[in-house]
Regions:
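Active-site substrate-recognition segment that forms the wall
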Residues: 22-26, 49-52, 81-86, 176, ...
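Glycine-rich FAD pyrophosphate-binding loop
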Residues: 25-45
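Helical element adjacent to the flavin cofactor pocket in flavoenzyme catalytic cores
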Residues: 140-197
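Beta1/beta-strand and adjacent pyrophosphate-binding region of the FAD-binding site
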Residues: 2-16, 32
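C-terminal catalytic lobe of FAD-dependent flavoproteins
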Residues: 150, 284-385
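Short beta-strand to alpha-helix junction loop
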Residues: 63, 93-102, 141-159, 169, ...
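Dinucleotide-binding Rossmann-like beta1-alpha1 core, especially the glycine-rich loop
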Residues: 48-128, 261, 290, 298-299
Length: 385
C-alpha cells in the first residue's frame, strides 16, 4: 500500500473503536480504522450485551455509565433496530447476609450518584422474576439497566462511521507507530505507512502491545470470560440479572477467589447467555469443561428452570482488565497525539457510547464535558494520588 494520510487512525474495530470512529465523523474528522481481524473479533464479539449500571462503583465510574446510558435511547433511533437495544431493567441478586449488608451500602451510594435503584426483599424479587428460587434473599432493581446486541452495535457504529467518511481496513494489522520528537507521525501497517497526527489506541486486551510501540507501559492484561449459550426458549426471565457476588468480585480479588458470580440475559431470539468466569490465562480464549461446569453449577440453584434448557454452545473472550477496574481514557504525557481508549474490561458495551463521544471531543477540541483526569494513564505511575 502506498503512503497515505488520515485525520486520525483508530487501532481496533471493536465496539470502542467503532464508537470513536462514528463520533469523530460527526465532528468533521474522517478517521481510518485498522483492524487485524474482523470487526468485533475480540472482546466485543465474545461477551454478553449488558448495559448494566448497578455493577458500577458509585462515583466517577457510575457517573460515566449514567452518561453513556443516557445516549443509548437516541442511538437506537440513529443506528436502527439492529442494535436490539432493550431497556429491560436489571436485578442484582443477593444470596447471603454478607452480600446484603454490602448491597445496602452500595444502594445508598449509588442513589447519591444519581442511579434510580431500590432494594427488594426476596418475596418481591420473586414476584418480579418468578423463576428465582428461595436461595435469593433480596435483590436490587434499577429500571436504567438494559441490554443490546454487541455485534449489532459494533457494526451499526461502523456503518454510520463509513457513511460519515470513515474508512475501515480489516485484515490489515498495525505493526508500529512512528514518533518524531515526542509527537505521533504515522502508523505503520504491514504494507505501508499512514501519516497521521492522532492515533487512538482502542486495541482492547492488546492495548498494552500498542502502547509499547511508543515506549509506554500500559497496565492492561487479558482476563478470560467464558459464557454459555442456551437454545432459544420462550421468555424465561424478564430482566437482565447479575449476582451480588459478581459485583463484589469485580472489585475485590479476595471475593473473586472464594467463588464466582453470574450474569444472565435473554436475547431477542430467546437464547439465554449465562456467564461468566474471570480468569487470568494470558491470551488463551478457549473454553474449558471446568469453567463451563462451574457456570452451570453456579446458576442452577438460583434459577432452577434453567436445568431444563439445553446448552447449544459456549464461547470465551478476553476482557481488557486494569488494576483499579476503570478504563484508561484520553491523552498520555510525553507522546503528543497518542490517545488511550481501552481497559473497559466487561464494561465496554455499556460505556461505548460515552467513550466514543469523549474521545472524539478531546481529539477535536482538547476538551471534554466529562473530566477524564481520573481515567488517565498517569494514575498508575508511582506517587500518583
Amino acid at each position: 500500500m502506498p503512503s497515505r494520510t488520515a485525520d486520525a487512525v483508530v487501532i481496533g474495530a471493536g465496539v470502542i473503536g467503532a464508537s470513536i470512529a462514528y463520533h469523530l465523523t460527526h465532528l468533521g474528522i474522517r478517521p481510518l480504522v485498522v483492524e487485524e481481524h474482523d470487526p468485533a473479533a475480540g472482546s466485543s464479539g465474545a461477551c454478553d450485551g449488558l448495559v448494566f449500571l448497578q455493577s458500577k462503583k458509585p462515583g466517577l465510574h457510575l457517573k460515566l455509565a449514567l452518561e453513556s446510558r443516557a445516549r443509548f435511547d437516541s442511538l437506537r433511533e440513529i443506528l436502527g433496530t439492529g442494535i436490539e437495544f432493550r431497556p429491560t431493567g436489571g436485578m442484582c441478586l443477593v444470596e447471603t447476609e454478607a452480600e446484603l449488608a454490602a448491597v445496602r451500602r452500595f444502594v445508598v451510594e449509588q442513589r447519591a450518584t444519581g442511579l434510580d435503584v431500590e432494594l427488594l426483599d426476596g418475596g418481591e424479587a420473586r414476584r418480579r422474576e418468578p423463576e428465582l428460587s428461595e436461595r435469593v434473599i433480596a435483590a436490587t432493581y434499577s429500571p436504567a439497566d438494559a441490554q443490546v446486541n454487541p455485534y449489532g452495535l459494533t457494526f451499526a457504529f461502523l456503518r454510520a462511521a463509513r457513511a460519515g467518511g470513515a474508512q475501515v481496513l480489516t485484515g490489515r494489522p498495525a505493526v508500529g507507530i512512528r514518533v518524531d520528537r515526542g509527537r505521533v507521525e504515522a502508523v505503520q501497517l504491514a504494507d505501508g505507512a499512514v501519516s497521521t497526527p492522532v492515533v487512538i489506541n482502542a486495541a482492547g486486551a492488546r492495548a498494552a502491545e500498542v502502547g509499547r510501540w511508543v515506549g509506554l507501559e500500559i497496565p492492561i492484561t487479558p482476563r478470560r470470560g467464558q459464557i454459555l449459550v442456551t437454545a432459544a426458549v420462550p421468555p424465561l426471565i424478564r430482566h437482565c440479572l447479575i449476582s451480588a457476588q459478581y459485583v463484589a468480585a469485580k472489585f475485590d480479588p479476595e471475593i473473586a477467589r472464594r467463588g464466582m458470580g453470574f450474569s444472565v440475559e435473554q436475547t431477542d431470539n430467546g437464547n439465554l447467555l449465562i456467564g461468566s468466569t474471570r480468569e487470568f490465562v494470558g491470551f488463551d480464549r478457549r473454553t474449558t469443561l471446568e469453567g463451563l461446569r462451574t457456570i452451570a453449577a453456579r446458576i442452577a440453584p438460583v434459577i432452577p428452570a434453567l436445568k431444563r434448557v439445553p446448552v447449544i454452545r459456549a464461547f470465551g473472550g478476553l476482557r481488557p482488565y486494569t488494576p483499579d477496574g476503570l478504563p484508561i481514557l484520553g491523552p498520555v504525557a510525553g507522546v503528543e497525539g497518542f490517545v488511550m481508549a481501552a481497559g473497559h474490561e466487561g464494561d465496554g458495551i455499556a460505556l461505548s457510547a460515552v467513550t466514543g463521544e469523549l474521545v472524539a471531543d478531546w481529539v477535536t477540541t482538547g476538551r471534554t464535558q466529562f473530566p477524564l483526569g481520573a481515567f488517565c494513564l498517569e494514575r498508575f505511575q508511582a506517587g500518583a494520588a
